[in-house]
Amino acid sequence: MNVANTQIGDWLGLHPLATEDDILRIVEGRLPPSVIKRLAALGLERSEIDAVVIPSRTLQHRRSRREKLTIEESDRVVRFIRALSLAGSVYGGPERALAWLRKSHPRLDGRTPLSLLKTDTGARIVEELLIQIDEGMFV
């Protein structure tokens, strides 16, 4: 069982997610809008949720119509949780991880890691940077 995947499931309030297939299944099944409250509980601010996951107005629309998030929005939720989990393992917990995600970084042309999580490509860059930091290749 992958510890990061289990943590993703815990943070989303879902059954333990053991594999990437489990994560794919929940993304394709579309997450409920209630997971956004969990992101806020983890410390993500509303403006950050708007920028990285789903705009407030769209979220309000989904809730009023009792719709699930789209596959793309669900994927963005998982993308953020995955980055937070990895940063937490590198920096020692979600609070420090969020602080790192919010701080501009020279390797990212002065952008914040959080701002790169809007896209899959950006998330991969953030993950690679975290792996390099963890292995002592870059600080």
Predicted region positions:
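Non-transmembrane "mature" sequence context
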Residues: M1-V139
